């Protein structure tokens, strides 16, 4: 699951390109189950929210938003591990 290390690195990049790259990397797993697809969508939504937070708010809010995105990504990873 090297893909997850790459996506986790993208969380720190926080750009529109990073969101697109994460979507491309995670799309390969969407067909496994509806639950996994929903978890991926939840992660991507939180990642987009993180981008907004980084661009629009003070730095004190950046780390909590990054932590939330990482938690959502961990959920996707856990679901995929159970599915395999």
Segments the model singles out, each with a brief description of its role:
Residues 1, 12, 16, 37-41, ...:
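Alpha-solenoid helical-repeat scaffolds
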Residues 1-27, 80-82:
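Short terminal alpha-helical segments
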Residues 1-4, 18-22, 36, 66-69, ...:
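Short amphipathic alpha-helical segments that mediate assembly, nucleic-acid/protein binding
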Residues 9, 13, 31, 53-60:
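General structural signal for alpha-helix termini and helix-helix connectors
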Residues 26-37:
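Short, charge-rich amphipathic alpha-helical segments embedded
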Residues 35-59:
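Long, amphipathic, charge-rich alpha-helical segments that form helical bundles/coiled-coils
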Residues 51-84:
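Amphipathic alpha-helical binding modules
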């Amino acid at each position: 699951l090297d893909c997850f290390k790459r996506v986790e690195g993208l969380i720190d990049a926080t750009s529109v390109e990073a969101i697109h790259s994460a979507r491309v990397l995670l799309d390969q797993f969407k067909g496994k189950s509806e639950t996994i697809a929903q978890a991926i969508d939840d992660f991507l939504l939180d990642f987009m929210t993180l981008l907004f937070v980084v661009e629009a708010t003070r730095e004190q809010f950046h780390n909590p938003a990054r932590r939330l995105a990482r938690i959502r990504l961990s959920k996707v990873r856990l679901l995929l591990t159970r599915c395999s």
